[in-house]
């Protein structure tokens, strides 16, 4: 899924296996003035990253197939600068390993009960506010 925005508009990649949430987040990103693409899992996200550069990557932690942790580690291996632009979404962290991972990468983490203002603020922290 793509969006037509001004060529200089920051680009956001949204990765989440929940179709409804992914669609909602894509809509919010577009309304905030960003260009946006989406993917339903980590592997599809990596495929998108091979095609273009993104200013922000919003990624679910728990997904079937390639989860967010594995996705992040692969992005970090391929392009450490891109890994610093990842924002994670999660309902809650269940395993100690996942908690340790999120704590260790120092990436922003949005609870999936986030408000639209929290989401927009997190994007703006990474790429700056949109006019």
Question: Residue spans of the language-model regions?
Answer:
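Non-catalytic signal-transmission and effector/linker regions of two-component phosphorelay proteins
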Residues: 1-11, 115-131
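Charged docking surfaces used in two-component/phosphorelay signaling
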Residues: 23-31
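Short hydrophobic/Thr-rich beta-strand motif most characteristic of the beta2 strand and flanking loop
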Residues: 33-40, 48
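Acidic catalytic/metal-coordinating carboxylates
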Residues: 40-44, 67-73
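Active-site residues of response regulator receiver
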Residues: 60
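Receiver (REC) domain active-site loop signature in two-component systems and cognate sites
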Residues: 63
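Hydrophobic/aromatic residues positioned on beta-strands within the core alpha/beta folds
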Residues: 89-90
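A Lys-centered signature of the CheY-like receiver
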Residues: 112
